Amino acid sequence: MAFKQLVAAISLALSLTTANAAVVKEKRATCSNGATVGDASCCAWFDVLDDIQQNLFQGGQCGAEAHESIRLVFHDAIAISPAMEAQGKFGGGGADGSIMIFDDIEPNFHPNIGLDEIINLQKPFVQKHGVTPGAFIAFAGAVALSNCPGAPQMNFFTGRAPATQPAPDGLVPEPFHTVDQIIARVNDAGEFDELELVWMLSAHSVAAVNDVDPTVQGLPFDSTPGIFDSQFFVETQFRGILFPGSGGNQGEVESGMAGEIRIQTDHTLARDSRTACEWQSFVNNQSKLVSDFQFIFLALTQLGQDPNAMTDCSDVIPISKPIPGNLPFSFFPPGKSMKDVEQACAETPFPSLVTLPGPATSVARIPPPPGA
């Protein structure tokens, strides 16, 4: 379903909320653990939740397994092309789990390199609990985000039929793509515009890279990869000064901090006139970051699906912890200041931020998942 159609469907559902309140109340059910959900079928997901929190996310951590689970949501969902369908070709099924079902094909596509590890970790849970791969990928991504302090309350809907064929190659953006290419790709996938593209990249706040630089694994995009905050949008605007590893890799540019990686697409989107002001708008604005990402994550997880035929099981997703009280929403890391910022937004000045005390240090790598 095209993104604008999705927005219309969501708006219609919201407009009917009051009128259908009595019906919704009757449908609500109490699960065996005492939790109340919007539909009795959602209760089974609490068992999945307990299992993956303990045995996939290492007791509910915002670590490598969580980061890769979030990445998997995007790579599964964005593989849909109405433009290809209009040409009589199969354009992929969007958020249908095809990347896991056809794990001998899609993980071998260049932008998906490295996702085989999280797919192999997730598949036993899919088989154990008898859920569809598409639903599990969306669920694991939402739970993963809930483990990251500062993240929004994530939505989760069930009702995805398993994919019947793999998505075609070439539908997942690459780190070396131009801004024009990426905007065109997300517009084709769901009629997303350049602002909504920036919202998607909020996920890089809790992310790391394993396969851009083959010499170094677990390189984060910002200095707080375990917290869903706007540091990613601050630090990608720092002047590039070094490579954290070998350098000269396709899709990588110099980063502004030791131990931190910067991919070409993030660098150019932070500086392009079409996206720079939206990029900067997240700096020191946690409420906007949270609300925009909550919206775009739901839209991504429903690409290729009919929202009206799905069941809202968002009650199962935990509420994330707040950002630690000893940190501001946005800040300059030790040793950094306004003089390090390459501001690209011509409309508004860069927000005034405090510089944390102490000496400049290298950003720590993210340990890989066990067995990876």
Swiss-Prot record:
Record-listed E.C. numbers: 1.11.1.14
Keyword Methyltransferase tagged: no
Residues that carry a glycan: N285
Purpose of the protein: Depolymerization of lignin. Catalyzes the C(alpha)-C(beta) cleavage of the propyl side chains of lignin.
InterPro entries: Ccp1-like, Haem_peroxidase, Haem_peroxidase_sf, Ligninase, Ligninase_C, Peroxidases_AS, Peroxidases_heam-ligand_BS
Gene: LIPA
Covalent S-S links between cysteines: C31-C43, C42-C313, C62-C148, C277-C345
Species of the source: Phanerodontia chrysosporium
Binding-site positions, heme b: H204
Protein name: Ligninase A
Required co-factors: heme b; Ca(2+)
One record GO biological process: cellular response to oxidative stress
Pathway stated in the Swiss-Prot or TrEMBL entry: Secondary metabolite metabolism; lignin degradation
Keywords: Calcium, Cleavage on pair of basic residues, Disulfide bond, Glycoprotein, Heme, Hydrogen peroxide, Iron, Lignin degradation, Metal-binding, Oxidoreductase, Peroxidase, Signal, Zymogen
Binding-site list for Ca(2+) 1: D76, G94, D96, S98
